[in-house]
């Protein structure tokens, strides 16, 4: 799993590192991160989990991670800054129905700052499941995020971020070069009008300073570098 080292936000934003991007996810609403493997989607998710489990600023910093494909690597999560003692890991063994039921149950439980449903390539989530999860989280303080390879039309998600891989980064001189990391782009695929307040620039002092090289991209796009 890659680890974030820097973030370049859209023009007009304070360069507060990746925190500005992670601060977009609204509590009490369903959000999505979509993108294929090696696109930075999983690494972005780990960065968010790390922020919440180490800050303790929301709901005690407790996170529930529903792992549809049993793909989470605890060692990589710890290297990304996740406090494993604040993480509830639910392994679903590739069973979509089990994953959906677990997420529906956990999002109704008080005390979680974040509930993640990571489906990866498991399959499209039924429209009825989207609606049920949205109703379950609505009005509360929990952030609910689903991650999958593709976005499903008709999803009620308030925020949808799409990731795509740009290029690898190499280290050393030829012929002894080695892969140092990956570069990916994160873009706002959808933001519901009723929640545009979540897109305002973060205030000064909110970020922990994952340094960006410049204001790259345009509109709601970020360029992220991930170290391996």
Language-model features, listed with the residues they occupy:
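Conserved inter-motif catalytic segment of the P-loop NTP-binding fold
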Residues: 36, 58-128
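Hydrophobic/aromatic beta-strand patches that form the interior of the parallel beta-sheet core
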Residues: 31-33, 64-66, 88-90, 145, ...
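Helical mechanochemical/support elements of P-loop NTPase systems and associated helical scaffolds
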Residues: 14-17, 29, 41, 45, ...
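Glycine-biased, low-complexity coil/linker segments
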Residues: 203-207, 212-213, 217-218
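Phosphate-binding/switch region of NTP-binding enzymes
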Residues: 135-199, 220-228
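A contiguous pocket-lining binding segment that forms or flanks enzyme active sites
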Residues: 111-152
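Detector for small/aliphatic-rich hydrophobic stretches
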Residues: 1-65, 79-85, 225-227
